[in-house]
């Protein structure tokens, strides 16, 4: 299939450094709120890239659940492929593709587990079905059929029908602690605007314009 003529024409006015907040987390919050206001589908969905000791990169979509100036938090099974890769190489990259706004945000940094207390707090906020789902799915393992998953779901649902679903020790959150955050805005004639925030040793952030 020849896709050489499949292209979009960017129409936004562009982005200037004077438009940016000096704090990348505040800039992210501004863009994130604008993505919500634009009614984008799951604006908190992002692609997470990790690399294990075999040096083969892996990428998948996960959901951002918390962010502040400490970092960006998502939740997963601690026995999953991504968790094993993070254990072997605690570095990650994330990409938020807000394409309807002609924007994307790329984040790179260190990654680590959050505390059990923080993970428990979020687990208790989830719908009961999602809590059960965390117990049912041995993430990334081969299964024989979907019906097996559904059977296990029903078994656990019946087991805890009159009580709380216990917190699984193999499930919890990770936080990406960024060292680089790049904001990309589409521009006419492919003259896109890219600004890179980099964390310095003194804790301050520098801002540089990058060629598109």
From Swiss-Prot:
Supply the enzyme class, top level: oxidoreductase
Query: Which residues of the sequence carry a binding annotation for substrate?
Result: 7-10, 65, 122, 126, 130, 190-192
Catalytic activity annotated for this protein?
pyridoxamine 5'-phosphate + O2 + H2O = pyridoxal 5'-phosphate + H2O2 + NH4(+); pyridoxine 5'-phosphate + O2 = pyridoxal 5'-phosphate + H2O2
- SS bond list: none
According to its UniProt record, in which pathway does this protein act? Cofactor metabolism; pyridoxal 5'-phosphate salvage; pyridoxal 5'-phosphate from pyridoxamine 5'-phosphate: step 1/1; Cofactor metabolism; pyridoxal 5'-phosphate salvage; pyridoxal 5'-phosphate from pyridoxine 5'-phosphate: step 1/1
Question: Which InterPro entries does this chain map to?
Answer: Pyridox_Oxase, Pyridox_Oxase_CS, Pyridox_Oxase_N, Pyridoxamine_oxidase_dimer_C, Split_barrel_FMN-bd
State how the cofactor is bound. Binds 1 FMN per subunit.
Cited Pfam families: PNP_phzG_C, PNPOx_N
Function comment: Catalyzes the oxidation of either pyridoxine 5'-phosphate (PNP) or pyridoxamine 5'-phosphate (PMP) into pyridoxal 5'-phosphate (PLP).
- Spell out the protein name for this chain: Pyridoxine/pyridoxamine 5'-phosphate oxidase
- Species per Swiss-Prot/TrEMBL record: Aliarcobacter butzleri (strain RM4018)
